């Protein structure tokens, strides 16, 4: 009811029914949890003794994608359905597979992978499981973030020496550098509406 009132008077969605995904250290493992926005009702999602990191919500809030470190040599990207607890692997290419993030429509997943040697950005079609390589550069490309429209990705790359922020079309074309101040600019995150 509170969320409906907030929306009616502000046009913005309320937070009363929102959840927060987080990582908790349990012994040597890092497990995924969700809790209510006020800290109540924590629920453990993983209990496998692995390092499970970097959870990201699907746009419909039914799924979380995350990086799981099953052994020292590979990091896979898994997805878990919150209602059922069903978990499956989306990316298991060998090497480092990190920083997964859903497109705004939920039809694609952008991530960074080093399975061919160097960290590059890839796009996974969540329905067909087809994978498209987005970047091909001698430098490392990491931390993709979708524009609200889903037409562009911003990411971190050290292709200009130190880490800087770059922008490209969602198909990997039209790559251009955005930051020129400072020696270390990383971990870009697009505002939900794109206006900040």
Annotate the PLM regions.
Residues 13, 24-31, 47-50, 67-77, ...:
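A flexible loop/linker signature enriched in serine peptidases of the S9 family
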Residues 43, 88, 132, 175-176:
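A structural motif specific to WD40 beta-propellers
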Residues 1-44:
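C-terminal/domain-edge helix-coil "capping" segments
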Residues 3, 43-81:
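Leucine-rich, hydrophobic repeat-scaffold detector
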Residues 36-40, 81-85, 125-129, 169-173:
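Short loop/turn segments that connect beta-strands within beta-propeller blades
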């Amino acid at each position: 009811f509170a969320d409906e009132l907030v929306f009616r008077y502000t046009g913005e969605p309320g937070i009363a029914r929102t959840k927060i995904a987080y990582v908790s250290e349990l012994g040597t493992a890092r497990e995924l949890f969700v809790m209510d926005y006020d800290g109540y009702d924590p629920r453990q999602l993983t209990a496998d003794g692995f390092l499970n990191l970097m959870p990201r919500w699907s746009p419909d809030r039914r799924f979380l994608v995350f990086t799981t470190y099953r052994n020292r040599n590979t990091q896979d990207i898994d997805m878990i359905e919150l209602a059922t607890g069903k978990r499956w692997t989306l990316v298991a290419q060998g090497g480092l597979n990190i920083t997964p993030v859903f497109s705004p429509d939920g039809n694609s997943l952008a991530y960074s992978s080093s399975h061919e040697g160097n960290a590059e950005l890839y796009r996974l079609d969540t329905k067909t499981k087809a994978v498209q390589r987005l970047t091909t550069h001698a430098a490392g490309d990491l931390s993709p973030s979708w524009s609200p429209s889903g037409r562009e990705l911003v990411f971190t790359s050290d292709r200009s020496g130190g880490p800087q922020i770059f922008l490209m079309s969602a198909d990997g074309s039209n790559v251009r550098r955005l930051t020129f101040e400072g020696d270390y600019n990383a971990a870009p995150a697009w505002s939900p509406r794109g206006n900040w």
